[in-house]
Swiss-Prot record:
SUPFAM superfamilies listed in its UniProt record: Ferredoxin reductase-like, C-terminal NADP-linked domain, Riboflavin synthase domain-like
Protein known as: Superoxide-generating NADPH oxidase heavy chain subunit A
A molecular function GO annotation: flavin adenine dinucleotide binding
Domain of life: Eukaryota
Length: 517
């Protein structure tokens, strides 16, 4: 078997290095915690009582402590946004925070299962041990109970079963097919983690093996979480004015807002709340305005329950174009909108590269709107100076031709002001055209494309990523290219695969980044 060369390792490291290190450290930490505890109890008097059952139960309990201490960290969005601005951003994959949060949750799930199964076995063995043997081996007085009483009549027993019920509620509501249509239910059940942590604190109060220590593991992360919530609460109290709501084709609402002291970077996102719809329901949306503009905007795709209600609230007459202006309060007197943020995202990293590939699928184009606007303003302010990015390849994939109208004005301006040809636009239409539209395209002779209104012609069908990446790999040999994507998972897999493949097989290094919030 051939070992990989130094160059192959370096190329693998481009997209996998920091993730691999984090997973290795996390795995080693879990193994060390389990093995240390297992060996400790193997050499303790308790092993004489119930054997390997106590070793396995306590090892799983140690995994629970470690992972419960970690699970809040990936959702501390303000902390992660701050850390993005430090040297740690070069080593820690902050964009994978939700993936890591889910990984920790699964480890907690399996550790809980192992802990419960081991103790069910231990309960069976406890009944065969007399109080005298407890006294002789462990030096304590302990009653002889039936397995049922151990499981349900002791503090550790009944709290453990309630913890399992809470976990079932939290885990099932987090399944995507349930979370998306019933987000508020997910929000409330996920906050049962407070009950979960509280029960685990008291779970070990009557332990005969060691003093309870769960609280020592979680007090730090819980303190950070409280600070996080206080920051978000204070920010959400700031007055937000809806200065304009505009209805675009293909069920997209553009909301432009003004609020106090809201500084952000291109590519970041915010959380939006409409108290009239749901007091505690916050949804993430990419910021589509640029920092140079005197408002903050989001483009919202009307696809779910909450966005549907927002559409009805802002556009009761089902009109197109501008439907609301300068609104502070909803008809019920509550604030029309509340903002929390901004928060860091993958697209923030775009200015680290001199050559970038931006891929937006449908409404996934939103983070790149902010970036392209920012570049436009920078070019206008610093004409003929060194640009922020040497070359931008912008791929916009839409199923519906009307979707191109969302940012047609911006794209048109960029095409006209395309200094040094820094921007290449590649619009793709994947949906079918009507017979009339086909005739217009075939026989039209306008200077602008009849589908998009851009000067760049529309391509039909899906992009051929292998050909595209092969071309870029030749064009940017020995260079680093940032690849940024926002859109569906299936397309993300294709782009990630292409980025990894052409990084390994050519001299170009494609750094893949995906929006994930």
């Amino acid at each position: 078997m051939r070992l990989p060369t130094k160059e192959e390792i370096q190329r693998y490291w481009v997209n996998e290095g920091n993730k691999l290190i984090l997973v290795i450290l996390y795995t080693l930490g879990n193994i060390a915690a389990f093995v240390y505890t297992f060996v400790h109890y193997y050499n303790s008097p308790a092993f004489e009582v119930v054997g390997y059952g106590v070793c396995f139960a306590r090892g799983c309990a140690q995994l629970l402590k470690l992972n419960c201490a970690l699970i809040l960290v990936p959702v501390l969005r303000n902390l992660l946004s701050f850390l993005r601005g430090t040297f740690l951003n070069n080593y820690v994959p902050f964009d994978k925070n939700i993936v890591f949060h889910k990984l920790i949750a699964w480890v907690i799930c399996f550790a809980t299962f192992g802990h419960v199964m081991a103790h069910f076995n231990n309960f069976r063995l406890y009944q065969d041990i007399t109080p005298q043997e407890y006294k002789r081996i462990l030096g304590i007085d302990y009653p002889n109970l039936t397995p049922i009483k151990y499981a349900f009549a002791t503090l550790a027993g009944w709290t453990g079963h309630v913890v399992c019920i809470v976990m079932v509620l939290m885990y099932t509501s987090a399944v995507e097919s349930i979370r998306r249509p019933m987000f508020e239910g997910f929000w409330y059940t996920h906050h049962l983690f407070v009950v979960f942590f509280g029960l685990l604190v008291v779970h070990g109060l009557h332990s005969i093996l060691e003093p309870t220590s769960f609280w020592k593991w979680v007090i730090g992360p819980c303190a950070l979480y409280i600070v996080e919530r206080l920051i978000r609460l204070l920010r959400s109290k700031k007055t937000t004015m809806l200065i304009q709501a505009r209805i675009h084709p293909s069920r997209v609402i553009e909301v432009r807002m003004k609020t106090e002291r809201f500084k952000y970077k291109p590519g970041q996102y915010l959380f939006l709340n409409c108290p009239t719809i749901a007091q505690n329901e916050w949804h993430p949306f990419t910021i589509t305005s640029a920092p140079e503009e005197d408002f903050v905007s989001c483009h919202i795709n009307v696809v779910g329950n909450w966005t549907g209600k927002l559409s009805t609230l802002l556009n009761p007459d089902k009109k197109m174009g501008i439907v609301q202006e300068n609104v502070l309060k909803s008809p019920d007197g509550k604030p029309i909108l509340r903002i929390d943020g901004p928060f860091g995202a993958a697209s923030e990293e775009v200015f680290k590269y001199k050559q970038v590939i931006l891929v937006g699928a449908g409404i996934g184009v939103t983070p790149f709107a902010s970036i392209l606007k920012h570049i436009k303003y920078q070019m206008a302010r610093t004409y003929n100076t060194t640009p922020l990015i040497d070359k931008v390849h912008f791929y916009w994939i839409c199923r519906d031709r009307n979707s191109f109208e969302w940012f047609s004005g911006l794209i048109g301006e960029l095409e006209m002001e395309n200094h040094n040809n820094f921007l290449e636009i590649h619009p793709y239409l994947t949906g079918a055209l009507s017979a009339q539209e086909i005739r217009d395209v075939m026989y039209g002779d306008e200077e602008k494309d009849l589908i998009t209104g851009f000067t760049t012609p529309t391509q039909f069908g899906r992009p051929k990523w292998d050909e595209i990446f092969a071309d870029h790999a030749l064009r940017y040999a020995e260079k680093d290219v940032g690849v940024f994507f926002c859109g569906p998972k299936l397309l993300s897999k294709s782009l990630y695969k292409a980025s990894t493949h052409y990084t390994k097989t050519t001299t170009c290094r494609f750094h893949y980044n995906k929006e994930n919030f």
